[in-house]
């Protein structure tokens, strides 16, 4: 095989978020060097050059999965897709970058969590990656560490949990403080939007009713619980003019809240995930416990069968913006930790490998979106929001050569028997998808071709992300200038002012306060 690093992709239809064109792509040293019709390589590059025929195929920017949890210690277990297996599977699906989450325990250092995840990922990743960092508690130390992470460590996104009471959940005043700091340091705030107090009470109620199976998971976390928290997060973010990113939007109700806020001018982005776009929560009522448990995730899939189509509609029309997978996989034996109590089932599903094909099938093949919108929601919008653009999320001169040769007419049947993930089931089992990645190129190297990998652990790199992403902060800065309240200019009051008598007792003070309140 010719040495990697010099590639000429011939005759494909290059698809970016804003236009498509038939052209060749010349890649050298991991970067796109030239685009054009009937492109001839430089004479000194002709030797050792590999030519890939993409005639009749699409040439796409590699996918960016905005939401993964590889080898995540959670609910007494650890997700089985580690940073090697998970990123290898991502490449097979046409994804060339993931953004995972470093999540500290309450009271623990954010920076130490970040370094822990870096140490786990750096030697293993097969594709490029970055890290969001979670804020699970609040103090002056947390505030300072957020600043350090944004300034020195390449982190420009911080996630707050409104659920998982007693574990990761933060209160409204902590959300306000964290959002305020995000704005100060030029980061984007992310939220897991569910009302954790209502979930905790609902879970007790379900168990008291004898509902111990996976259906209890959805019953104690209904749509209203997600929608309420989504609106609350948007309200708090708006109060401090902080950009907000709502992860895993799972219900019609929550999606409507995001859509309404965007149409009202709020700087907010919604992220549906492959699971919510490709299947629904009727699975929780399966009489086969393991099948039902395989689908347990938070927020849950919704039993309304119209939900996936509704979310795809909003993704297609711009009310929702990006797509992730929330890939957090636990094998059946791990899910069985909750065989007698649904609250103990580790939350999480697969999706990092199948995200691109599921969205093509449900979005493009169905006629809801075109190829350009597909690129926007699977790659470009994420690159813009998280300040990776145009190095990522675009095929242009100077961009990283993260490229997928995509066959829009080919089909594949999703199955745990053939997928490349470590988990022993697949929530999309049996789904036939149009849209198949034939070749995946990461950092200028062909890493996956015709079902064969050519990649080793550590090929991928950590990609730092700078704060104050122009795509989101242009509007934030303008809103600061035009929407910040100002005092009314008026002449000073010069009339009589009543003199209050001194109060001698606490009771008099209280009574006086009441009287003043009614004056």
UniProtKB/Swiss-Prot annotation:
Which residues are annotated with the PTM N6-succinyllysine? 256
| Residues annotated as binding substrate | 164, 347
GO MF annotations, alphabetized: amino acid binding; dihydropyrimidinase activity; phosphoprotein binding; thymine binding; uracil binding; zinc ion binding
Phosphoserine is found on 79
CDD domains reported in the protein's UniProt record: D-HYD
* Transmembrane intervals: none
Task: State the InterPro entries in the record.
Answer: Amidohydro-rel (IPR006680), Hydantoinase/dihydroPyrase (IPR011778), Metal-dep_hydrolase_composite (IPR011059), Metal_Hydrolase (IPR032466), Metallo-dep_Hydrolases_sf (IPR050378)
Q: Which residues bind Zn(2+) 1?
A: 67, 69, 159, 326
The modified positions for Phosphothreonine read: 510
Q: Which domain of life is it from?
A: Eukaryota
Keyword entries, A-Z: Hydrolase, Metal-binding, Phosphoprotein, Zinc
**Entry EC number(s):** 3.5.2.2
Zinc is among the record's keywords: yes
Tell me how the cofactor is bound.
Binds 2 Zn(2+) ions per subunit.
Q: According to its record, what are the GO cellular component terms? A: cytosol
Residues annotated as binding Zn(2+) 2 are 159, 192, 248
Q: What kind of modification does the protein receive after translation?
A: Carboxylation allows a single lysine to coordinate two zinc ions.
The record ties this protein, via SUPFAM superfamilies, to:
Composite domain of metallo-dependent hydrolases (SSF51338), Metallo-dependent hydrolases (SSF51556)
At which residues is N6-carboxylysine found? 159
Q: Which reaction does it catalyse?
A: 5,6-dihydrouracil + H2O = 3-(carbamoylamino)propanoate + H(+)
The record, for NCBIfam families, names:
D-hydantoinase (TIGR02033)
Q: What does this protein do?
A: Catalyzes the second step of the reductive pyrimidine degradation, the reversible hydrolytic ring opening of dihydropyrimidines. Can catalyze the ring opening of 5,6-dihydrouracil to N-carbamyl-alanine and of 5,6-dihydrothymine to N-carbamyl-amino isobutyrate.
Family the UniProt entry places it in = Belongs to the metallo-dependent hydrolases superfamily. Hydantoinase/dihydropyrimidinase family.
Subunit arrangement?
Homotetramer.
Annotated protein name in UniProt: Dihydropyrimidinase
